[in-house]
Amino acid sequence: MIDVVAAVIVKDNKFLITRRAPKLNLEGMWEFPGGKIEKGETPEEALKRELAEELEIETEVGNYIETSIYEYPNVTVKLMAYFATVISGEVKLSVHDEAKWISISEVENYKFAPADIPFIEK
């Protein structure tokens, strides 16, 4: 099982989603940004690090939302979601090929990675 964290970043009643780039697992699917927890890190530390590395933003991690466990064909992912706020920086893509701020009413227009879907339903 892989432990992963994701951020639900809300700004002006919209939240940030990112699209997985070609050649990545689940390419073309949308997700809440985040990444794998490294040994010795708390979920909150991992989330701050991943958002800085992948999107070049500094964030404040807020409340825990919930955990989603999803069994993909080759791996089981335990995904923990937290609210987060951007403190500084503008979103710059390095791993993903697109980022969008969307409203909850727009969610149905995007195909999300299966592990992220429970957070949308929340």
How would you name each of these model-derived features?
Residues 16, 31, 81:
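Conserved beta-strand segments that form the floor/walls of ligand-binding pockets within enzyme
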Residues 32-64, 103:
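The catalytic Nudix box helix
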